[in-house]
Amino acid sequence: SDASAQKLTKTGATVFRGDLEDLESLKSGAASCDAVIHTGFNHDFSKFAENCEKDRLAIEAMGSVLVGSNRPFIVTSGIALLRAERPVVETDTVGEDTPRKASDEAVAKIAAQGVNASLMRLPPSVHGAGDHGFIPILINLAREQGFAACIDDGENHWAAVHRLDAAKAYRLAIEQGALNRVYHAVGEGAIAFADIAHAISEGLGVPLKSLTMEQAKDYFTWFTHFAA
């Protein structure tokens, strides 16, 4: 957007305008950089699988101009995509049933072709001023439904990180990172979902309800995977 471009210009950065579906613009932008950080994704969840495939193409396009250069390419993914009955670690992989695996697969493909490509997995809560992520989604759901909710006892846990700490993790990955790595940018590692729902309940002055999985699908809809 123009507003975002102005913010970057004020910091002394040069703005290059591109589009996730304009692969030539992505190639041109990546070719002109000493390092590339990819954080863009179309969050229209009504077209989630389609958008995941578009992200695959975007990653492969940018990677194609970085082959053999050793210039770092950091691609953003998510910790919430990993499923395990224990705290997840960097060596865990995205499930085959998750369309978002397309991004991880693209990183592995271009790394095999000679690109210094790494994954930065962000937790479901990247919080701080200007938060546009999952917590605002939960707050809006509670406003719309008239209550905050968790599934069963809400003892599933979310990781979290402040947005400035996440930015620092990207910088360190560029400046000091090793070749073809996976990073988890985590500040707080074990926040019970029930505690998040309770805070939303208190903040909005609405009830807090425990839902069964079937009830949760009606309440959270596409977000159920992340709330479970």
Residue ranges and their predicted role:
Residues 114, 139-151, 206-211, 215:
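A short C-terminal helix-loop "cap" of Rossmann-like NAD(P)-dependent dehydrogenase/epimerase domains
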Residues 105-129, 134:
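Conserved beta-loop-beta element that borders a ligand/cofactor-binding pocket
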Residues 101, 127-137, 144-145, 172-183, ...:
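Glycine/proline-rich active-site loop of Rossmann-fold NAD(P)-dependent oxidoreductases
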Residues 2-60, 64:
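NAD(P)H-binding glycine-rich loop region in Rossmannoid oxidoreductase-like domains
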Residues 167-225:
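Mid/C-terminal beta-alpha module of Rossmann-like enzyme folds, strongest
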Residues 123-157, 163:
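NAD(P)-dependent short-chain dehydrogenase/reductase
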Residues 42, 54-99:
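Conserved Rossmann-fold NAD(P)-dependent oxidoreductase catalytic core, especially the SDR/UDP-sugar
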